[in-house]
């Protein structure tokens, strides 16, 4: 039986990472990797779209907006496709009171308040919602940037998140040293996925 995205031949891939320290990686994916993947998908009558929510906003601006709700909505709309990029930063941890103050606490995500009370970052909330807690199959992959000896990971929550991601066997996890290596890994992963979901010898008319 075909999934809804196989019937519609439409794939949306959500890219998750912290705001500030993954600009080079996101640029590599958006400007180099995804154009090539889109062409491969197009040749199979598939529309492939990456969801990159940077939009040029800073973390400070995000704290006073509905960016949390937008992220969760986009993850839901992109499910089951998800890319997680993890570096050294754990990311912005908004308080429940801050979101309520700015009227950015979405009612349809009732579980969000508990995650905020636990002090979760938006990045971990994205990962938990999009992948780790998903009861349905996911087409996810995670890419963990190797830390050089001079860089100290000071937040134990980030180390724990990386360990949690690594220990889950529902998806592939890769280590990378450079944006270029990341690009090669993502391109290979999603070429394989396209071959699996939309075999080249079974192209359907639009």
Predicted segment positions?
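Conserved catalytic or regulatory cores that recognize and/or transform ribose-phosphate-containing ligands
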Residues: 1-206
